[in-house]
Amino acid sequence: MSRADGAAIPGVSRRQFLGLGWFPWLAPRHIGLAGARFRILRNGRSQRRYLRIHGNEETARRVLERHMETHEGIAYVIESRTRVVAVESLKLDPNRMFSRVGAEANLTLLNPGAAAEQVRRALGVLDRGREKLVRALTPPKGGVTIALHNNSSGYSVAAEVPISDRSSLRQPGIPHAFFLCTDPRDFEVLKTSPYNVVLQQHGPEDGSLSRLAAARGFRYVNLEVAAGEAERQWEMLNWLEWFMG
């Protein structure tokens, strides 16, 4: 797309310009895959993408919605109130649906009595719709996808260190708060922070978005804090925004 003076507008096609530049209200407000439906929040034209994928992680929702009031980017906020969603009447962790292998393992785990045919149908639904959601969550070149998560007493950075390529534990006494990234250049920046951080480029396939990001080579940062620690998550997100390009 070009301006009237002939100068190109980088990264914007004519269709995008007409559909979103002149008529921003035409941009979709929701996107989904199977039982996972996401509300889309837009602010400006930043290359950042944000995600809150688990419906029971209320701290992450509040922090992300607050963040989007003052920062540019596109955020995807799941509308479910529960950790799992339904696919063909089966339970599925939405952060295990980004590969067929991961989705099948999770469907089998969460639905031990399900018939093989029912699992097969659920996988078919995911296979047909997965790429559209992945395209939305993938940042433009040079951008980054930031996922906000909350955890409980049963999970911490200690579970990630053994399967990580590198780690920097600046706050070993606060193991529930950490960054997980997939790009070594981002790790070099994040390790200068006062927070815990791990780099995972070669973790075992589990259907998560972080594994997909590592496989496809796009920048991804997962920001984990304990449930209820909104101010800590807000502080870490602001650090990330300030210091990461």
Task: Write out the residue ranges for each language-model feature.
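Hydrophobic/aromatic beta-strand patches that form the interior of the parallel beta-sheet core
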Residues: 76, 146, 198, 221-223
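Catalytic-site microenvironment of enzymes
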Residues: 28, 35-37, 58-63, 195, ...
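Anion (oxyanion) recognition and catalysis
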Residues: 68-69, 191, 214
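Active-site-adjacent substrate-binding region
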Residues: 174-201
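N-terminal catalytic or cofactor-binding beta/alpha core of small enzyme domains
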Residues: 30-182
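N-terminal secretory signal peptides and thylakoid transit peptides that target proteins
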Residues: 3-24
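Active-site-adjacent mobile loop/cap segments within catalytic or ligand-binding domains
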Residues: 200-245
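C-terminal segment of N-terminal export signals and the immediately downstream linker at the start
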Residues: 10-15, 28-29, 34-36
